Amino acid sequence: MKRGKDEEKILEPMFPRLHVNDADKGGPRAPPRNKMALYEQLSIPSQRFGDHGTMNSRSNNTSTLVHPGPSSQPCGVERNLSVQHLDSSAANQATEKFVSQMSFMENVRSSAQHDQRKMVREEEDFAVPVYINSRRSQSHGRTKSGIEKEKHTPMVAPSSHHSIRFQEVNQTGSKQNVCLATCSKPEVRDQVKANARSGGFVISLDVSVTEEIDLEKSASSHDRVNDYNASLRQESRNRLYRDGGKTRLKDTDNGAESHLATENHSQEGHGSPEDIDNDREYSKSRACASLQQINEEASDDVSDDSMVDSISSIDVSPDDVVGILGQKRFWRARKAIANQQRVFAVQLFELHRLIKVQKLIAASPDLLLDEISFLGKVSAKSYPVKKLLPSEFLVKPPLPHVVVKQRGDSEKTDQHKMESSAENVVGRLSNQGHHQQSNYMPFANNPPASPAPNGYCFPPQPPPSGNHQQWLIPVMSPSEGLIYKPHPGMAHTGHYGGYYGHYMPTPMVMPQYHPGMGFPPPGNGYFPPYGMMPTIMNPYCSSQQQQQQQPNEQMNQFGHPGNLQNTQQQQQRSDNEPAPQQQQQPTKSYPRARKSRQGSTGSSPSGPQGISGSKSFRPFAAVDEDSNINNAPEQTMTTTTTTTRTTVTQTTRDGGGVTRVIKVVPHNAKLASENAARIFQSIQEERKRYDSSKP
């Protein structure tokens, strides 16, 4: 191409101070002294692209232009413009020239038909970039008429100490925005938006306050631009392939980094069919990477190709799971998971409750003695007979004057099993005459010297005659073994009171492996500090304990109605006569671990013999004469334990059975978790047995 023709076309636009509004400033001024070098740089493509190809071969895809010194220009003109690096150190006033440049933008936009980008580097002083971006290509399947309606407006909007924004706007629904940098000034952004709506083409140069360019006279430069379309398009394609479809730009002034994520098929719209096909294939291969670089208005095809790859595991919704598993399997699995969570929540609650109760009881067993006096005052009327009460909270004190509905069948025993657990203590209470005292064993007025007399005692019953009360105290006799002797007790209502279970007071520290049955009111000097009647059975006196009876009230320590019966008083059987029947009383048992002070553990029976009725005994018996005038019931508690496990045997005339209990209260609070695990396992096993026994 001819240099003279190009010089004539380029000469006028390159006067930087020439502007249409310079009339008030004294007219045009002298051009810069090195304008001829600029003309040569703009006119010779080989020189321009040779230097630029070297710069683009860098690994970081960036290039920095030479910063001219103000001494090389008459008025201190300083420019720093590049495609990849733009230094806007003196461009505060450049935003005022957008309106005056609209006519030139329309001319360039209407004539530009291809995606191209022209970069110029001036080795000495200047760097004048020219951005030309055409309409979208036909690679997206748009018709030629549709392409004519598309408008792309790449803009370079400089501002002082800010980045430059390169934005491609498509008014009819452009699918791509390429952002080189951001304009931080509001007025710059507003002007950029206005230019984008108008579909114009903006070229803004960084100039000093005293230097302006008359862009209206530079329309003739468009002919020169058309001459370089082919070479620019080829260079742009090569550069985009080298950069992987992306160009990074760094603004060193602001420290901000922006990305130029472009696609070949969108940058080179009207190339040959081969180019379009190549661009389409390349864009699809780079779709996933480009999705992370472009903004939210990226093209639909890129977004569709990359949507599946960009989904992370955190974004999976229940609908996705349903689609994979199927609706039936999903609901079946969901139901199973919900049931397991529900069961686990109940089990966890029970386990935590056991641990908490054990720690409370183990930490302060002696403090619970202060509340014994109110235990005997609990009214049995406050506990409904036919209601299954939680064994963790209540112990119904059987009273002779309370009329209890007779139980004629054993179905309530099964009904009680549902609530049964190893947390509760099982005991049987029955009345007996005070004349049977000689058949019972240890624990007299004064604590015996031997460690054996450590067992359970119950509150007194009113004596058979007179207005005073009488206690039957177990005493270890050297000739007879464990016997009971009468002892006058203080006035008392005679209630078998006591709360057994979670968060309830234990009156005394009881022997290990044996459940507590009942406690007398405090203040009796004939009881040892932590004295209880031993639950370990003495074989010597086991033959002296049997009594034929039909108890009026039979209930466990937790007041379940399945253990209550109305019976009539009967005479004592012979010493060697075994109990005819045993009835199993499946109850919730809340055992407590205690330090054993019994010396007769070795004599305790084990196995079935230890739990038979013939081996059972009554810890004590107290008779209320006033309440027995009209065939008042007698109550007997028969318990036995084995050396291998703690067992409570309940002996009645109408049935028999055995309920095993496990110790709960540890010696110290550190063992609470270990014991709770064992109790929890026992609860689960008991529930399994109950479920298997269901019809």
UniProtKB/Swiss-Prot annotation:
Region (Interaction with ELF3): 261-484
GO MF terms, alphabetically ordered: DNA-binding transcription factor activity
Organism: Arabidopsis thaliana (Mouse-ear cress)
Nucleus found in the keyword field: yes
Protein name (record): Protein EARLY FLOWERING 3
Disordered: annotated span: 1-33, 48-75, 136-159, 216-283, 541-653
Primary residence: nucleus
Basic and acidic residues composition-biased segments: 1-11, 216-226, 234-253, 260-283
PANTHER family, sorted: PROTEIN EARLY FLOWERING 3
Biased composition annotated in UniProt, kind: Low complexity: 598-616, 636-653
Protein task: May be a transcription factor part of a circadian clock input pathway. Acts within a 'zeitnehmer' feedback loop and is involved in its own circadian regulation. Has no role in regulating circadian clock function in the dark. Part of a corepressor complex consisting of ELF4, ELF3, and LUX involved in the transcriptional regulation of APRR9. The activity of the protein may be decreased in long day conditions due to its interaction with phytochrome B (phyB). Can regulate the initiation of flowering independently of phyB.
Quaternary structure (record): Interacts specifically with both Pr and Pfr forms of phytochrome B. Interacts with ELF4. May form a homodimer.
Cross-referenced InterPro entries: ELF3-like
